[in-house]
């Protein structure tokens, strides 16, 4: 493990509970295809506020889970120390998209209705069965007294325009909803 740090960190997954006694851990992947998490190396974790690079030794499927073995993690006690650590990579490793957006690109964007009402900023994204949903933290002086809005990311239908240079998303949405 080295102390390098990712320049633009992005979370791709999380280490779960131990598997067995030889230092294996379950992994929860946030990538669209769960096994794609292994396409992005090196991995970084944060321990005690410091970045550590971890090296993947091996991985395999076990029932519905994915389990991993990291170099230098030889027993259950060492693996236990990594439970719940987020798996982070440098976002520069992600492929450029011809069409569409990474969730990370939408975070912090100001959301405005087609009528010009400022709904707030994107603070999170949720995946539902049918479509993604923007989680928007409303401005402090929201006229409708709303603190948080959930707006479906339906391109063309609700989402009218995404401008990553100005960090704005224009939506056709009722601010009172």
UniProtKB/Swiss-Prot annotation:
GO terms for molecular function: ribosome binding. Residues 98-177 form the PRC barrel domain. Pfam families: PRC_RimM, RimM. InterPro entries: PRC_barrel-like_sf, PRC_RimM, RimM, RimM_N, RimM_N_sf, Transl_B-barrel_sf. One of its GO terms (biological process) is ribosomal small subunit biogenesis. Its main location: cytoplasm. GO terms for cellular component: cytoplasm; ribosome. The keyword Chaperone applies. Keywords: Chaperone, Cytoplasm, Ribosome biogenesis, rRNA processing. Signal peptide: none annotated. It is found in: Cytoplasm. An accessory protein needed during the final step in the assembly of 30S ribosomal subunit, possibly for assembly of the head region. Essential for efficient processing of 16S rRNA. May be needed both before and after RbfA during the maturation of 16S rRNA. It has affinity for free ribosomal 30S subunits but not for 70S ribosomes. Belongs to the RimM family. Binds ribosomal protein uS19. The PRC barrel domain binds ribosomal protein uS19. NCBIfam families: 16S_RimM. PANTHER family: RIBOSOME MATURATION FACTOR RIMM. This is Ribosome maturation factor RimM. It comes from Enterobacter sp. (strain 638). The lineage of its organism: Bacteria, Pseudomonadati, Pseudomonadota, Gammaproteobacteria, Enterobacterales.
């Amino acid at each position: 493990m080295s102390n390098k740090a990712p320049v633009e960190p992005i979370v791709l997954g999380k280490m779960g509970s131990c598997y067995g006694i030889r230092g294996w851990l379950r992994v929860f992947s946030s990538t669209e295809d769960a096994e794609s998490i292994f396409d992005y190396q090196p991995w970084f974790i944060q321990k005690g506020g410091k970045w550590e690079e971890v090296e993947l030794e091996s991985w395999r499927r076990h029932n519905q889970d994915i389990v991993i073995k990291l170099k230098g993690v030889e027993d259950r006690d060492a693996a236990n120390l990594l439970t719940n650590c987020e798996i982070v990579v440098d976002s520069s490793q992600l492929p450029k998209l011809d069409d569409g957006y990474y969730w990370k690109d939408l975070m912090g964007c100001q959301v405005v209705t087609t009528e010009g009402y400022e709904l707030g900023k994107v603070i999170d994204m949720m995946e539902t069965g049918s479509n993604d949903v923007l989680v928007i933290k409303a401005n402090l002086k929201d006229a409708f007294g709303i603190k948080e809005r959930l707006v479906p990311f339906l391109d063309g239908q609700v989402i009218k325009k995404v401008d990553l240079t100005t960090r704005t998303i224009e939506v056709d949405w009722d601010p009172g909803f």
